[in-house]
Amino acid sequence: MARVKRGVQAHARHKKVLKAAKGYYSARRKTFRVAKQAVIKAGQYAYRDRKTKKRQFRQLWIIRINAGARIHGLSYSRFINGLKKSGIAVDRKILSELAVYDKSVFATLAEKAKAALSA
């Protein structure tokens, strides 16, 4: 039986890793051993940050809604409570967009929330 050399597979594997490390600086781009570690670490960061992105955007939306609600004399929690009591089901992403870009619609929502809280 002929001896099997693994040069082709090794070269393909190295090429794959170095392609994934494109755009990195110095040895992280050129040297296979260092590039492999850098690609693995980048994957770990990407996995972690896909989770934190959701948290960060929710925080941003809440900050924007709170700022918009305080202009109309409500805190964030009272505004959300008022919306729930009045039966308005709008998610935080849309509420934050309204608070930033469509202030007149947000003002009507704030008035409805106030009315539901006082009733």
Curated annotation (Swiss-Prot):
One of its GO terms (molecular function) is structural constituent of ribosome. Keywords: Ribonucleoprotein, Ribosomal protein, RNA-binding, rRNA-binding. One of its GO terms (cellular component) is ribosome. InterPro entries: Ribosomal_bL20, RIBOSOMAL_L20_CS, Ribosomal_protein_bL20_C. PANTHER family: 39S RIBOSOMAL PROTEIN L20. Binds directly to 23S ribosomal RNA and is necessary for the in vitro assembly process of the 50S ribosomal subunit. It is not involved in the protein synthesizing functions of that subunit. This is Large ribosomal subunit protein bL20.
